[in-house]
């Protein structure tokens, strides 16, 4: 199984909550975190199999755009991220999210 990282950045917290909810409901992914960037920008991060992350990000984009005032600013998927990223960036499976891991 090839593990990927998927990210959606929105303007506004309600949009990112809606996106995150839809992402974990639409595919077998694990929500590993979120980052508040500033100026209302928030990024949500999921991990899972490449195809599942792709489906998850698509569902998240659609959901965030349904929120009144919600705006998707950026999305990206990294297939097979280098293991060094996990030790520097907030994309690793933590103890808090391990119970929700889907694979």
From Swiss-Prot:
CDD domains linked to this entry: BMC_CcmK
Molecular-function annotations in GO: structural constituent of carboxysome shell
Leader sequence residues: none
Main subcellular location: other
GO BP term (any one): carbon fixation
Gene Ontology annotations for the cellular component aspect, listed alphabetically: carboxysome
InterPro entries: Bact_microcomp_CS (IPR020808), BMC_dom (IPR000249), BMC_shell (IPR050575), CcmK (IPR046380), CcmK-like_sf (IPR037233), CcmK/CsoS1_BMC (IPR044872)
Gene3D superfamilies: 3.30.70.1710
Residue span(s) of domain BMC: 4-90
SUPFAM superfamilies xref list: CcmK-like
Location(s) in or outside the cell: Carboxysome
Keyword entries, A-Z: Bacterial microcompartment, Carbon dioxide fixation, Carboxysome, Photosynthesis
Function field: One of the shell proteins of the carboxysome, a polyhedral inclusion where RuBisCO (ribulose bisphosphate carboxylase, rbcL-rbcS) is sequestered. The central pore probably regulates metabolite flux. Hexamers make sheets that form the facets of the polyhedral carboxysome.
Family recorded in the similarity comment: Belongs to the bacterial microcompartments protein family. CcmK subfamily.
Domain notes: The tight homohexamer forms a pore with an opening of about 5.9 Angstroms in diameter which is positively charged. The C-terminal flexible tail, which is the most variable part of CcmK proteins, seems to be involved in packing of hexamers in layers.
Subunit structure: Homohexamer, might also make dodecamers. Interacts with full-length CcmM. Forms mixed heterohexamers of all possible stoichiometries with CcmK1, which might form dodecamers. Only very weak interactions with CcmK3 and CcmK4 were seen.
PANTHER family tied to this protein: CARBOXYSOME SHELL PROTEIN CCMK4, PROPANEDIOL UTILIZATION PROTEIN PDUA
Stated name of the protein: Carboxysome shell protein CcmK2
Source organism of this protein record: Synechocystis sp. (strain ATCC 27184 / PCC 6803 / Kazusa)
